[in-house]
Amino acid sequence: MSKIGNSGSESKNTLYCSFCGKSQHEVRKLIAGPTVFICDECVELCMDIIREENKSSGIKARDGVPTPQEIITVLDDYVIGQQHAKRVLSVAVHNHYKRLAHQSKSNDIELAKSNILLVGPTGCGKTYLAQTLARIIDVPFTMADATTLTEAGYVGEDVENIILKLLQAADYNVERAQRGIVYIDEVDKISRKADNPSITRDVSGEGVQQALLKIMEGTIASVPPQGGRKHPQQEFLQVNTTNILFICGGAFAGLERIISGRGEKTSIGFSATVKAPDERCVGEIFRDLEPEDLIKFGLIPEFIGRLPIVATLEDLDVNALVQILSQPKNALVKQYQRLFEMENVELAFHEDALRVIAKKAIERKTGARGLRSIMEKILLETMFELPTLEGVQKVVISSDVVDGKARPLYIYSERVEDKENVSA
């Protein structure tokens, strides 16, 4: 009976966290307040929530707009490398929203909008940069694929549908939508199909460029609230696109040859000078980009004129891809480690294994976009087996596993019975 009494008194003296309900024996530290207790785990969780809120909403400057330094600091947490592109984007976005914040204060000088063109190899982070920027500024964001767009009246998507998507992202709040960001991907695919204007209409190339001119510069777009094609009986929402920031991105495959060959005069005969091929990587060649190169590629001068800010992105090397795998907040390695944690298993990668994964992605010429498919292939069998295996504590991935020369190393935890046998 005395034992029961002692256990009852012990349970009364045990303190519990007022938030998660864990006892003082289950946590490292329990902090007492006037009437409540909070454990160290709940404190860490609260700090994580506050940090994420600060990151998602952005740290506002005095005039309500994040400074370029604050924007680039947040970008560094999510995007590896591309320092030049980050600087160009952070300054451009800061100036754009500073212009909107001071628009009503002075009427003497009207500041024009500066849309942005991102040029870089596939998988180098163009789309991700635009998405992260919208999250920092906390404005509605939508992404459109230029390959699906056609001129009005033809089968395909009208350019007005881009504004409709932005309106949907703003929960049909027109005022918020008019300050949003639109990212148009694969803009290189709407280049003119030939150097000279064709007799037949190019409805998915030059025609789309012509259709985009007005909404990029600023116009009142009539948007059908339900989407789809317009009809006379339908009511329209009027959206002013003057203050919407347009960011266009594309890989521009073959543009590097136009840049390298600019100004070259070809000659034949024994006196002809033989020029060595440009051995620079694509990202380095893109740094010398001029508007005339984009015109030769197939963009019309009026379209290029609507994109005064050009940010070129570099190729990702092995070191950059290894950093992308492991360092950002939502890095691929961390994502798969979280998946394995759900099975109470620790996932570990050797450093040389990450380098082999990065080299495979470079060989595929898919940049950072190809990393996930490589990781899936490596971990497929392990993720299939784990839910049915018992006692697995840790899975280790080496370079041989990535190359297909070995299986992942499974480390099992000691069973309770084994421990008792050893102690006996």
From Swiss-Prot:
Positions annotated to bind Zn(2+): 17, 20, 39, 42
GO (cellular component) term, any one: HslUV protease complex
GO BP annotation list: cell division; proteolysis involved in protein catabolic process
Keyword terms of this UniProt record: ATP-binding, Chaperone, Metal-binding, Nucleotide-binding, Zinc
Gene3D superfamilies: 1.10.8.60, ClpX chaperone, C4-type zinc finger domain (6.20.220.10), P-loop containing nucleotide triphosphate hydrolases (3.40.50.300)
Residue stretches making up the ClpX-type ZB domain: 5-58
One MF annotation (Gene Ontology) recorded for this entry: zinc ion binding
Superkingdom per UniProt: Bacteria
Pfam families reported for this sequence: AAA_2 (PF07724), ClpB_D2-small (PF10431), zf-C4_ClpX (PF06689)
Residues the entry annotates as binding ATP: 121-128
Transmembrane segments: none
Subunit structure: Component of the ClpX-ClpP complex. Forms a hexameric ring that, in the presence of ATP, binds to fourteen ClpP subunits assembled into a disk-like structure with a central cavity, resembling the structure of eukaryotic proteasomes.
NCBIfam families assigned: clpX, PRK05342.1
Function field: ATP-dependent specificity component of the Clp protease. It directs the protease to specific substrates. Can perform chaperone functions in the absence of ClpP.
HAMAP family for the chain: ClpX (MF_00175)
Family in the record: Belongs to the ClpX chaperone family.
The protein's name in its UniProt record: ATP-dependent Clp protease ATP-binding subunit ClpX
